[in-house]
Amino acid sequence: MNVREAAFHSLIAVCKDGAYSNIVVSKIIQKEKFTDRDRRFYTELVYGTLRSLNYVDYIIGILSSRKKNSLDPVCLAVLRMGLYQLFFMDKVPPSAACNEAVKLARRFGNEGMAKFVNALLRNSLRQKERLAIPTFDENPVLHLSLTWHQQSWLIEKWITEFGQEHTVTLCRYFDTIPELC
């Protein structure tokens, strides 16, 4: 199993089946015996995609004619993983992210799904300015949710409880990836 395929299966297990990401990731790493580089890529792809679900789902909502909840779980996992690579992994060439996503959609879905994935991912590259996060002044809850990877309901609760300034501080704190010992 290649790295992207392993990440795809992990995302399906977590997002569709409700598995715990840390357990899924540990099992895959033990089973697959990835090289150090592949292990780091796999881990970033899974955890990064999960951390960025708000933003990648926001993009899907803007670009897709279909509602996110009506998409096949295979299609949704492939799109999320592809969009994460396009928008957050600067060392992954866009062509590789798109092509590999299409291969996954074709292998685990069908040709129609592969075409849909290809169209949405390539469209996201052409329409980056349309996909900009609303400013804080336009929509503070959506801005903080997408920027700092927190759920909107939680942002609303924090703003009510602590005010906007302290909410920004909380968002920054909880989005910080801890340093390794």
Task: Show where each model-derived region lies.
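Class I Rossmann-like S-adenosyl-L-methionine
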Residues: M1-C181
